[in-house]
Amino acid sequence: MTFEFAKRPTIKGYPELRWTGKRPYESTQYYPAQLREQYGETINGWINKIFWGDNLQVMSHLLKDYRGKIDLIYIDPPFDSKADYKKKIEVKGVGKTQTDTNSFEEKQYGDIWTNDEYLQFMYERLVLLKELLSDTGSIFLHCDDSRNFYLRCLLSEIFGEENFRNEIIWKRSTATGLATKRCGTLHDTIYWYSKTENYYFEMQYHEYEEDYLKRARKDENGRMYIPIPTGNPGPRPNLYYEYKGYLPHANGYKWTREKMEELDRQGRLIFPESPDGRIQYKQYLDEMKGTKLQDIWLDVYPVNPVAKERNGYPTQKSEALLERIIKMCSPQNGLVL
């Protein structure tokens, strides 16, 4: 069984990443794959699955049943960090002496590549992942500063720059003293692309930061609120009008005159003392879920050495990080790879 891939049309002036030995990846064969493990109880005929083997062959295997059906993909590929990653394996029943230990290190994978090998490796897998993704699906690619600039070019070439959604900065570690002649590296990068413009998204929130809460005020009923501008973020000439002697921002108000009058009756407007000032709006804290999630994630911590979820894998990512991504871009009962 052969699977053919639709080739993205060549657009004049559209950038494309080139490297020595770049080979088009326009089809693949169906491969049998080894279903290694299953987790949980069957739900509507589905059970969580883990495949072991070369991921290119496993994805080719998945095309038969899941082409265009996967709602969310998260990948944490090799970073080309020029290092070998090892996991400490405990040996039961072996006591420590001065000359031996009760554990040994097992190599998990080597992350040392030449440029052309690495780029071809990632290119072929991203093409396959696009084929697996549903039209409302998203892909999140986790990387660091080793090759992130190349990976973004590849993602834009395959998924289209118009489907780029965010470059997420995740603070993965605390300060380190390893860097002596440059700034220390504290973050990873997560690129988010969608398959189309019609992608699933559920806004996520996090707790209010202390600096934000310092701006809060209390109304006559004891409710806490934040004063926010009433100006429109974009030019709206039809919403530019005077209200009770006060002019809006140059873009106009956010709301129609009728809506402003309704907010005024509710006591939601704050009028300035100066005639040249601008009206503000009371945004009550108890009406909001928190602060809307932005593209810098400082509140999701890496797996600490004594965490229950830690399995010893050298580049393990936290469950909290994956939970946030899944809640944000996978519908209920969605299919996640």
Write out the residue ranges for each language-model feature.
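Core catalytic lobe of class I
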Residues: M1-L337
